[in-house]
Amino acid sequence: MSWQTYVDEHLMCDIDGQASNSLASAIVGHDGSVWAQSSSFPQFKPQEITGIMKDFEEPGHLAPTGLHLGGIKYMVIQGEAGAVIRGKKGSGGITIKKTGQALVFGIYEEPVTPGQCNMVVERLGDYLIDQGL
């Protein structure tokens, strides 16, 4: 299965029977290389991925400045140290799951809820971890 298929079929999937077209997603290597992404995923700067990786290594690193992706600032909210970073901006937000080799991103806006985004992103991340990725 290609990485793009994981994005298209597992991250951009329908949630509870409704299209999640308000969700942007990507799978990005720890080095910032894009493995696959949805067409709506923002163009990001390498230093934004560096900051995200640093927060996984040192939880709380992004809390004072916020999480930035594609020039958009998200307020960092409760996550799982070293495993999941969550951010909020207005009625939407972001979930990032770290695997052994990649970062799985989900960006959402209403009507998608934080819990729905978390479930989709973390489920794929857990699967990739189980596969040694």
From Swiss-Prot:
Keyword Phosphoprotein appears in the UniProt entry: yes
Chain positions of motif Involved in PIP2 interaction: 83-99
Classification via SUPFAM superfamilies: Profilin (actin-binding protein)
One of the record's GO cellular component terms: cytoskeleton
Domain of life according to the entry: Eukaryota
Keyword Disulfide bond recorded: yes
UniProt keyword annotations, A-Z: Actin-binding, Allergen, Cytoplasm, Cytoskeleton, Disulfide bond, Phosphoprotein
Disulphide-bonded residues: C13-C117
Molecular function GO terms recorded: actin monomer binding
PANTHER family linked to this entry: PROFILIN, PROFILIN-5
Family named by the database record: Belongs to the profilin family.
Extra remark: The variability of the residues taking part of IgE-binding epitopes might be responsible of the difference in cross-reactivity among olive pollen cultivars, and between distantly related pollen species, leading to a variable range of allergy reactions among atopic patients.
Record text on subunit structure and interactions: Occurs in many kinds of cells as a complex with monomeric actin in a 1:1 ratio.
Protein name: Profilin-1
Source organism (scientific name): Betula pendula
Lineage: Eukaryota, Viridiplantae, Streptophyta, Embryophyta, Tracheophyta
Gene behind the chain: BETVII
